[in-house]
C-alpha cells in the first residue's frame, strides 16, 4: 500500500494495517519514524542515538494528515527512543512513548526501542485460505481478555513465566470455547 493510500485510509479510520505506516521502521538507510500528532506544532524524535535532544531530529508533517515523519540514519535496531511533541496551541512540550512501538524497555522506563525487520517466514497459507471463506460479519464475537500477571500465580504468589503461563492458559481458553 502506498503512503498516500495508507494515510487516506488512516484518516478515514479504515486503515487496518496502520502499524505498517506508523511507529519506527528500520532498514538499510536507518530508521523511519512516523507518529500521528494532529495538534502538534512541532514533533521530534529523541533517543540514545541523539543524546535525547529534541532539536537534532525534527519530524516533518505529511500534508494535513496529522502524521509526522523523519528518517534518521543514526537510529538502529536496539536504540531507545520517544517523541518530543510541542502542542501548537499552548507551546507545551511533552515527551511521549510511541503508541505504535514494537518493543519497550522495562519499567520504570517507558521508551520504545527500535526492532529490526522481521525475518520470520509465516507458514499459515492453509489457514488464511480457510479464513477467506469465513463470513466473519455473521459470526459471533468471543473475546477473552486476561491479565497475565494476575490470572494465575504459583502457590507462593510468584507470577508464572510466559512459557509456564502458556502451558496453563491455552488449555483453559480452549476448554472455554476460544
Where are these regions (language model features)?
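The feature marks proteins involved in alpha-glucan
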Residues: 1-32, 62-157, 164, 169
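Short beta-strand elements bearing conserved aromatic residues within extracellular beta-rich modules
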Residues: 43-45, 81
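Short proline/glycine-enriched turn/loop motifs at strand-loop junctions of beta-rich domains
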Residues: 36-43
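Short loop/turn segments at connectors of secondary-structure elements within structured domains
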Residues: 39, 53, 77-79
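Aromatic-lined carbohydrate-binding/catalytic grooves of carbohydrate-active enzymes
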Residues: 160, 172-178
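Short, surface-exposed loop motifs enriched in S/T, G, D/E and P with embedded aromatic residues
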Residues: 55-63
Amino acid at each position: 500500500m502506498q503512503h498516500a493510500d495508507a494515510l487516506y485510509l488512516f484518516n478515514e479510520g479504515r486503515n487496518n494495517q496502520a502499524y505498517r505506516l506508523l511507529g519506527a521502521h528500520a532498514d538499510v538507510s536507518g530508521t523511519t519514524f512516523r507518529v500521528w500528532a494532529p495538534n502538534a506544532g512541532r514533533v521530534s524524535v529523541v533517543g540514545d542515538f541523539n543524546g535525547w535532544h529534541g532539536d537534532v531530529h525534527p519530524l516533518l508533517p505529511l500534508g494535513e494528515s496529522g502524521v509526522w515523519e523523519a528518517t534518521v540514519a543514526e537510529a538502529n535496531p536496539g536504540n531507545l527512543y520517544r517523541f518530543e511533541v510541542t502542542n501548537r496551541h499552548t507551546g507545551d512540550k511533552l515527551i511521549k512513548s510511541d503508541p505504535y512501538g514494537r518493543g519497550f524497555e522495562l519499567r520504570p522506563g517507558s521508551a520504545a526501542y527500535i526492532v529490526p525487520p522481521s525475518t520470520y517466514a509465516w507458514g499459515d497459507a492453509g489457514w488464511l485460505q480457510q479464513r477467506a471463506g469465513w463470513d466473519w460479519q455473521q459470526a459471533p464475537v468471543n473475546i477473552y481478555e486476561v491479565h497475565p500477571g494476575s490470572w494465575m500465580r504459583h502457590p507462593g504468589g510468584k507470577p508464572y513465566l510466559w512459557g509456564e503461563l502458556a502451558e496453563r492458559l491455552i488449555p483453559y481458553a480452549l476448554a472455554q470455547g476460544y
